[in-house]
Amino acid sequence: MAKLTKRQKAIAEKIESGKQYAFEDAAKLLAEVSAVKFTESFDIAINLGVDPRKSDQVVRGATVLPNGTGKTVRVAVFTQGPGAEAALAAGADRVGMDDLAAEMKGGDLNYDVVIASPDAMRVVGQLGQVLGPRGLMPNPKVGTVTPDVATAVKNAKAGQVRFRTDKNGIIHTSVGKVGFDAAALKQNVEALLSDLKRLKPSTSKGIYVKRVTLSTTMGPGLVIDQASLEA
């Protein structure tokens, strides 16, 4: 059996196996045991009572976290005319059409979010093999194909997270950084849960939100007592 490192021992001493933690207690404990040389993210995993093999039970969408993610988000926008001016005014890092597409085909993909107006999809459609594997392809279901590109840019910059159930029916996303106030982090998670419940498929039966687990980038996962969350 492999020996535990000092850090693993310290974590094991503080965490009770099988316990469900009140959200703010979990956030504070995870911050305490964080001992890496970079600022870790807080990540959430939410097990949903859906059958991801059925297309009508795939849950996907986007949530603007009220307190942001703590990350600097780079946004590229495909649009033209007044939309281009509005996108730049809203804080977009790069706005263009064919010129932007050429840059991306050439490997310039240093963006976290790509947004497009509907009239720009003729250009964006050429980039499926470039943007798709990186999760950057604009999609109307998560608000990244929209005539209101300015609002989409503001939402992305403010800390919007996009989510989709994986093959096991689990939603994974970052909800903040270690160093966030626990109450602010809780508000972010509650906003996400509220949207997930709004998007519950009509064909989903039984318990919908089955399990909520909070972790840090390099840390353990703690199961959250859902009674400690208001959503």
UniProtKB/Swiss-Prot annotation:
GO terms for cellular component: cytosolic large ribosomal subunit. GO terms for biological process: regulation of translation; translation. This is Large ribosomal subunit protein uL1. CDD domains: Ribosomal_L1. The gene is rplA. It comes from the Bacteria. Keywords: Repressor, Ribonucleoprotein, Ribosomal protein, RNA-binding, rRNA-binding, Translation regulation, tRNA-binding. Pfam families: Ribosomal_L1. Binds directly to 23S rRNA. The L1 stalk is quite mobile in the ribosome, and is involved in E site tRNA release. It comes from Stutzerimonas stutzeri (strain A1501) (Pseudomonas stutzeri). Belongs to the universal ribosomal protein uL1 family.
